[in-house]
Design a protein with these regions (language model features):
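Specific transmembrane alpha-helical segments of multi-pass solute transporters/efflux pumps
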Residues: 23-70, 106, 190-208
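Membrane-interface helix-cap regions at the ends of transmembrane helices
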Residues: 17-34, 101-115, 158-182, 225-236, ...
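Loop-to-transmembrane alpha-helix entry segments
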Residues: 33-38, 67-70, 83-106, 113-120, ...
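Transmembrane alpha-helices of multi-pass small-molecule transport proteins
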Residues: 3-49, 76-77, 129-136, 153-170, ...
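Transmembrane alpha-helical segments that form core, pore/gating elements
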Residues: 18-22, 77-78, 112-171, 186, ...
Length: 278
C-alpha cells in the first residue's frame, strides 16, 4: 500500500473497520465521561497517531529498516509504565527489555538506506505513542476497569476520530485504492489485524507485568519473519534469526526467573517497612 494508497486514508479505513467490529459493544451506562475520554485517548495514541507515523515512515524505509527501528519499544514500555505508576524506575525491567532489543536487533540488522534519520525519527515517535497507548490502557484497566470489549469500543472510537481529522486535513483524494487486492488488504488489516489482533494483544497486556509486555512486543520480529516465510516463501537469514530469537526468549526467562520475583519482593519489603514506621 505504501506509495500507492494515501497513508491517511489507509489509516482511516483500518481503524474505521476495527471500530465497526466493536461498535455493538459501545456502552455509556456506569462509566464517567472522564473514564470514557481516557479510553478514547489511549486508542487515539496507540492506533490513530501511531498508524499515521508508521505509514509515513514506510515512504522512507525498507521493511527491514522499519522492523529494526521498532526494537526499542520494550524499553519505552517499561519506563513509561513506571512513570505512569509513579514508582521508582525498575532498572531490572529495563535490563531484561534491553536483552529483547538486542535479540530483535540481531535478527533485523541490515544495511540502512539514505533516509536513516527521517525514518528513525518517525518510527521512534511511533514507538513512543504506541507505548503510551498500550501502557495507558493497562493502567486504566488497573485503576478504572470496565469489560474489555466495552473498553475497546471507546478505544477504537478515539483512534477513528484522529484518523478522520487527519484525512480531512492531510489526505490526498487522488491516491485512493485502485485494485481489489488493495481493498482486500485494507479490509484484512482493519477487521483481523486491528479489530481482533489489537484486542487480543491489549487483553494479554492486562494479564502480565510491564517487563513481560515489553519483551513480548519484540516477538513480532521473529513471528513476522515466519509469517513472511509461510506466505511469501522469503527465507530469513537463519543463523541470525535463530540467535536473535534465542536471545529474546532468554530475556523473557531472565525476567520471569530473576527480575520480576526480585522486584516483587522489593516492593513487599518497602510496604512492610512503611507499615512498621507508621
Amino acid at each position: 500500500l505504501a506509495g500507492h494508497v494515501d497513508s491517511y486514508f489507509a489509516v482511516l479505513v483500518r481503524v474505521g473497520l476495527a471500530a465497526l467490529v466493536f461498535l455493538p459493544f459501545l456502552r455509556t451506562r456506569g462509566n464517567s465521561l472522564k473514564t470514557v475520554g481516557l479510553y478514547m485517548l489511549v486508542g487515539a495514541m496507540q492506533l490513530g497517531v501511531m498508524y499515521m507515523l508508521s505509514f509515513r515512515a514506510y515512504l522512507y524505509l525498507t521493511v527491514s529498516e522499519l522492523l529494526l527501528f521498532t526494537v526499542l519499544t520494550p524499553l519505552y514500555i517499561t519506563l513509561i509504565y513506571d512513570i505512569m505508576s509513579k514508582r521508582r524506575l525498575r532498572w531490572g525491567y529495563a535490563f531484561s527489555a534491553l536483552l529483547a532489543v538486542i535479540g530483535a536487533g540481531i535478527i533485523r540488522y541490515d544495511q540502512v538506506t539514505d533516509h536513516f534519520w527521517t525514518g528513525l525519527l518517525l518510527v521512534q515517535l511511533s514507538n513512543i505513542t504506541f507505548a503510551i497507548g498500550m501502557v495507558g490502557y493497562k493502567r486504566l484497566m488497573e485503576t478504572r476497569p470496565m469489560p474489555q470489549h466495552n473498553a475497546f469500543a471507546w478505544f477504537y472510537l478515539g483512534a477513528f476520530l484522529v484518523a478522520v481529522i487527519a484525512w480531512f486535513l492531510l489526505g490526498n483524494a487522488q491516491k485512493m485504492p485502485q485494485t481489489t487486492l488493495q481493498w482486500g488488504i485494507l479490509v484484512f488489516l482493519g477487521v483481523v489485524a486491528s479489530g481482533i489482533g489489537y484486542f487480543m494483544w491489549n487483553y494479554g497486556a492486562t494479564q502480565v507485568d510491564a517487563g513481560t509486555l515489553g519483551i513480548m512486543n519484540n516477538m513480532h520480529v521473529p513471528a513476522g519473519l515466519l509469517v513472511n516465510l509461510a506466505i511469501w516463501h522469503q527465507q530469513p537469514h537463519w543463523p541470525t534469526f535463530i540467535t536473535g530469537a534465542l536471545v529474546i526468549l532468554a530475556s523473557l526467562w531472565v525476567h520471569r526467573k530473576w527480575v520480576a520475583p526480585r522486584s516483587s519482593q522489593t516492593a513487599d519489603d518497602r510496604r512492610r517497612d512503611c507499615a512498621l514506621s507508621e
